[in-house]
């Protein structure tokens, strides 16, 4: 039986006037506050001093296609990918964005603008990242159109397939589904937000036309709003840069400088054998611990389901490892509206229907603060007990 901590309101976000029974656990979003404790222990190693006269210009490097990319961030990105071995950076253009969300929109815009006919179909295999729907429908562009689930897509003409691997929300390793290798109008955007060794085995060095990464899910620094794209084709990269210029006239330099500093510190910790010092070892152990606790709660219940992930050899750690995804794809064996049932127990989650799936599934963030996660486990276990009593 899994041992749960005594219930208490999470210290940093609780209101002392709210009883514990009324506290709402919000695991709908992927706010990665789980890593706060690690970075707190790092003390001043990530501190950046910015004077009032620093970083005032729009421009960073006018010789770079992405002229608002700070050179020190570009170097830090290349160095980290080199150490981890998860993506090729040679002969590529690095485009920085305000998170990978802006970069995904920029990539869809770029590929659509270069297509021979429009609107270009945009698809993703279900269950898919729910925000893809919003990103491709919100501005009602005539250049592209959301066509939904890639599994059943057979429409002729240009299309863009969004491939997230490991997948958000279910954590599975994904490849393209539509697969039209001889079609020069077939384009793919690979989202590798979670392809890092604390979440999944690094099985190969990814080498695709457009690869997206986000600072927030590597280190937990979501508030910095930094992402980057590794792009092979110069014209696509130029179009992406143009989109970002029109959308936000570049990307915050303060955020870029801070990101570069933290990525460099992270890279240095990779040399350490200490689990408390080496960020990826720390993160993997934390995620393993959380997944083991969640699986124990689910095992003791006959009501819930979780995916199983095969072991794979991780080139970074040099051994076979399991995956510990950033989100849990929680299901129920009954024909139950699970998001509503969890809400009834004051747990917020992402409805499976928003991800192209069904009401029996929800996406639950595994990246909350430890005390919030423990409250979630206790409430999930209590739902199991209520189920048993009803039977």
Swiss-Prot record:
Task: Tell me what the record says results from residue 250 to S.
Answer: In sav3-3; reduces growth rate under shade condition
Gene Ontology process terms (BP):
auxin polar transport; cotyledon development; cotyledon vascular tissue pattern formation; defense response to bacterium; embryo development ending in seed dormancy; flower development; gynoecium development; indoleacetic acid biosynthetic process
> Which annotated residues bind pyridoxal 5'-phosphate?
58, 100-101, 168, 191-194, 214-217, 225
Question: Could you tell me the EC number(s) of this protein?
Answer: 2.6.1.27, 2.6.1.99
- List N6-(pyridoxal phosphate)lysine occurrences by residue: 217
Keyword list (alphabetical) reads: Aminotransferase, Auxin biosynthesis, Cytoplasm, Pyridoxal phosphate, Transferase
Q: Which family does it belong to?
A: Belongs to the alliinase family.
The role this protein plays is: L-tryptophan aminotransferase involved in auxin (IAA) biosynthesis. Can convert L-tryptophan and pyruvate to indole-3-pyruvic acid (IPA) and alanine. Catalyzes the first step in IPA branch of the auxin biosynthetic pathway. Required for auxin production to initiate multiple change in growth in response to environmental and developmental cues. It is also active with phenylalanine, tyrosine, leucine, alanine, methionine and glutamine. Both TAA1 and TAR2 are required for maintaining proper auxin levels in roots, while TAA1, TAR1 and TAR2 are required for proper embryo patterning.
- Which protein is depicted? L-tryptophan--pyruvate aminotransferase 1
Q: Which organism is it from?
A: Arabidopsis thaliana
| Gene it is expressed from | TAA1
């Amino acid at each position: 039986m899994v041992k749960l901590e005594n219930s208490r309101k999470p210290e940093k976000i609780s209101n002392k006037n709210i009883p514990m029974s009324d506290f709402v656990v919000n695991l709908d979003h992927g706010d990665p506050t789980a890593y706060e404790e690690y970075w707190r222990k790092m003390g001043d190693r990530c501190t950046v001093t910015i004077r009032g006269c620093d970083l005032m210009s729009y421009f960073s490097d006018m010789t770079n296609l992405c002229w608002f990319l700070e050179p020190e961030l570009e170097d830090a990105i290349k160095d980290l990918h080199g150490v981890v071995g998860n993506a090729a950076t040679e002969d590529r253009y690095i485009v920085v964005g305000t998170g990978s969300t802006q970069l995904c929109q920029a990539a869809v815009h770029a590929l659509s603008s270069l297509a021979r006919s429009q609107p270009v179909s945009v698809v993703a295999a279900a269950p898919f990242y729910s925000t893809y729907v919003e990103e491709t429908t919100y501005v009602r562009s005539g250049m592209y159109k959301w066509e939904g689930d890639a599994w059943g897509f057979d429409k002729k003409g240009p299309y863009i397939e969004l491939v997230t691997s490991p997948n958000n929300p279910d954590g599975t390793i994904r490849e393209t589904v539509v697969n039209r290798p001889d079609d020069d109008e077939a384009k793919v955007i690979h989202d590798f937000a979670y392809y890092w060794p604390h979440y999944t085995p690094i099985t190969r060095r990814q080498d695709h036309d457009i690869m997206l990464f986000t600072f927030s899910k590597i280190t937990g620094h979501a508030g910095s709003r930094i992402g980057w794209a590794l792009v092979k084709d110069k014209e696509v990269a130029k179009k992406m840069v143009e989109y970002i210029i029109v959308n936000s006239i570049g990307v915050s330099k303060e955020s870029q400088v801070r990101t570069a500093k933290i990525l460099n510190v992270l890279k240095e910790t990779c040399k350490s054998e200490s689990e408390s010092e080496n960020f990826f070892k720390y993160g993997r152990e934390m995620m393993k611990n959380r997944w083991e606790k969640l699986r124990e709660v689910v095992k003791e219940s006959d009501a819930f389901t979780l995916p199983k992930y095969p072991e794979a050899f991780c080139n970074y750690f040099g051994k076979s490892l399991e995956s510990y995804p950033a989100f849990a794809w929680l299901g129920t064996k009954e024909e139950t509206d699970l998001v509503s049932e969890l809400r009834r127990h004051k747990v917020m989650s992402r409805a499976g229907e928003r991800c192209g799936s069904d009401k029996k599934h929800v996406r639950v963030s595994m990246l909350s603060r430890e005390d919030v996660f423990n409250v979630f486990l206790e409430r999930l276990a209590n739902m199991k007990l209520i189920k048993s009593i009803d039977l």
